[in-house]
Amino acid sequence: MANLRKTHPLLKIANDALVDLPAPSNISVWWNFGSLLGLCLAAQILTGLFLAMHYTSDIATAFSSVAHICRDVNYGWLIRNMHANGASFFFICIYLHIGRGLYYGSYLYKETWNIGVILLLLTMMTAFVGYVLPWGQMSFWGATVITNLLSAVPYIGNSLVQWIWGGFSVDNATLTRFFAFHFLLPFIIAAATMVHLIFLHETGSNNPTGLNSDADKISFHPYFSYKDLLGFAILLIALISLALFSPNLLEDPDNFTPANPLVTPPHIKPEWYFLFAYAILRSIPNKLGGVLALLFSILVLMVVPILHTSKQRGLTFRPITQFLFWLLVADVAILTWIGGMPVEHPFVIIGQIASFLYFFLFLVLAPLSGWLENKILEWY
């Protein structure tokens, strides 16, 4: 008799994805981040659910309800710290996952890659509306500044902003709908993740060589299930350590002050994981231009597969493009630093140079270096 896990209508779906899935034998720890993102999403949904049980989405009580969660709810402080810092770990894993995809040419699985970019946008939206919920100073002013960017849309801009606000300013209606969005979006992310996996399992995983690995596959369980569990343990230990020892390390001090529409904080800035995009937004002196640059800083990932010129898939054997990849990593680090700095000399010009380089690397230098490496291969 055939094994139940291979015949049962539900179990065989799980079996084909988690047990008998053929995986390349040589995928490295860089292939762990997909499952770590799944763990992050599960942790965020779980902690978020418990926070939502005690949170009130009303401007009169939102700030107090978060304080109440941290002071009076059993282990509420832990749940809140895990949720807030879990978002940071979520984005660390996302950026490493995208970096892996760029380095090893995983973007050539176009459907998987494009769903991944959509997942990134959904996660950024979720994190943004979530940051507004505690209704501190930075929550309020962050919401005001970022939603205001939509006024740059020609003709319908102002109507669009007021429609999203539900009034003439960021107010009670805004907070209530942002809570609704923040509750709903993670489940949409979970659904999109399933689509991401469906497309991935159509082709199978890429591997560090970028070569076809059909001749050398091993089963996902036990090899990679245990490898993933090791990753889970490391991530959870890191997250719990941050949440217990230094929970406010990545938090903005302004957000410990209740929202006040009459007092603008001296430096309005988003959470650290959005600073690179914020720096690109600020580096263009025109409002609409800045908004488009902000949007394209993420959407540029979608054109990466189209601009792939190399005969080789990954960067394993491509030293010139390798150098450009690490230049991009350094550039994003510089943009992250600039995004948290005041708008004054020399930060403005550094941000503008870094923003230009960001797009130049993706759109010009990477395709050129791929072409050049092809030529070098022909010469030798």
Curated annotation (Swiss-Prot):
Q: Lineage of the source organism? A: Eukaryota, Metazoa, Chordata, Craniata, Vertebrata
Which InterPro entries does this one have?
A: Cyt_b/b6_C (IPR005798), Cyt_b/b6_C_sf (IPR036150), Cyt_b/b6_N (IPR005797), Cytb/b6-like_sf (IPR027387), Cytochrome_b (IPR030689), Cytochrome_b_C_euk/bac (IPR048260), Cytochrome_b_N_euk/bac (IPR048259), Di-haem_cyt_TM (IPR016174)
Name the Pfam families on file. Cytochrom_B_C (PF00032), Cytochrome_B (PF00033)
The UniProt GO MF terms for this protein read: metal ion binding; ubiquinol-cytochrome-c reductase activity
Its name, as the record gives it, is Cytochrome b
Q: Which cysteines are joined by disulfide bonds?
A: none
Q: How does it sit in the membrane?
A: Multi-pass membrane protein
**What role does it play?**
Component of the ubiquinol-cytochrome c reductase complex (complex III or cytochrome b-c1 complex) that is part of the mitochondrial respiratory chain. The b-c1 complex mediates electron transfer from ubiquinol to cytochrome c. Contributes to the generation of a proton gradient across the mitochondrial membrane that is then used for ATP synthesis.
